């Protein structure tokens, strides 16, 4: 598989994630060295959902991120293209909806805030996905995007690149039910826009005031923006 076939069709991506659903959460904890829970908490704090607000958690997977967002008292719905992932999170008591990030099954101006964590890379046309998220968000509403990015310390960046190339695939073979998905993960991270490039893409696709905070030396970048009022 060359470059993890980064031009996969949406159905292929969904099928790939269907196969990892049952072990997805534990695999992410292992591969992130336990940082995933902290990243979810910081995403919730940045989005700052309020009691009574409606929040869309796109590419929610097993809804572990939706569960974290729900701690705020907001009404949070998990939306994902992979039925297998949603099924794997069936025990989590949050609303779940199957949906394509390029054609969201919600009316205009439905949500007070929208977030997507580690899923924007997997939307075939991620700029269309950003516009769709803006469409379903109320004027003045908020966006938070947590996504793997480029480490800001050069030496650490070299170590991280080696981790993605040499260590992540064999670890995934041990802990994941579908190691191919994590080869795709590594390749898609390396091909992803840098922090400033993603901020520019957010600003030209229905949002404004895009900025970011680097987490764990920039392994993850937490972008935020608002929809024009």
From Swiss-Prot:
InterPro entries: SAM-dependent_MTases_sf, UbiE/COQ5_MeTrFase, UbiE/COQ5_MeTrFase_CS. Belongs to the class I-like SAM-binding methyltransferase superfamily. MenG/UbiE family. This is Demethylmenaquinone methyltransferase. It catalyses: a 2-demethylmenaquinol + S-adenosyl-L-methionine = a menaquinol + S-adenosyl-L-homocysteine + H(+). Methyltransferase required for the conversion of demethylmenaquinol (DMKH2) to menaquinol (MKH2). Keywords: Menaquinone biosynthesis, Methyltransferase, S-adenosyl-L-methionine, Transferase. It comes from the Bacteria. The gene is menG. Pathway: Quinol/quinone metabolism; menaquinone biosynthesis; menaquinol from 1,4-dihydroxy-2-naphthoate: step 2/2. It comes from Corynebacterium aurimucosum (strain ATCC 700975 / DSM 44827 / CIP 107346 / CN-1) (Corynebacterium nigricans). S-adenosyl-L-methionine binds at residues 62, 80, 100-101, 117. Its EC number is 2.1.1.163. One of its GO terms (molecular function) is demethylmenaquinone methyltransferase activity. GO terms for biological process: menaquinone biosynthetic process; methylation. Disulfide bonds: none annotated.
């Amino acid at each position: 598989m060359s470059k993890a076939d980064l031009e996969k069709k949406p159905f292929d991506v969904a099928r790939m994630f269907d196969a990892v659903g049952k072990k997805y959460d534990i695999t992410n904890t292992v591969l992130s060295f336990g940082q995933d829970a902290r990243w979810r908490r910081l995403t919730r704090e940045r989005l700052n959902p309020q009691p009574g607000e409606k929040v869309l958690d796109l590419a929610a997977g097993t809804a572990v991120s939706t569960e974290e967002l729900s701690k705020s008292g907001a009404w949070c719905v998990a939306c994902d293209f992979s039925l297998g992932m949603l099924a794997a999170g069936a025990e989590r008591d949050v609303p779940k909806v199957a949906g394509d990030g390029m054609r969201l099954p919600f009316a205009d101006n439905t949500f007070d805030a929208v977030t997507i964590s580690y899923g924007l890379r997997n939307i075939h046309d991620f700029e269309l996905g950003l516009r769709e998220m803006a469409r379903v968000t109320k004027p003045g509403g908020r966006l938070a995007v947590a996504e793997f990015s480029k480490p800001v310390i050069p030496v650490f960046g070299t170590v991280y690149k080696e981790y993605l190339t040499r260590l992540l695939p064999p670890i995934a073979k041990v802990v994941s039910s579908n190691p191919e998905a994590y080869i795709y993960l590594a390749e898609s991270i390396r091909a992803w826009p840098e922090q400033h490039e993603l901020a520019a893409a957010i600003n030209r696709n229905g949002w404004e005031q895009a900025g970011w905070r680097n987490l764990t030396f920039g392994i993850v970048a937490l972008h935020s923006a608002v929809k024009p009022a």
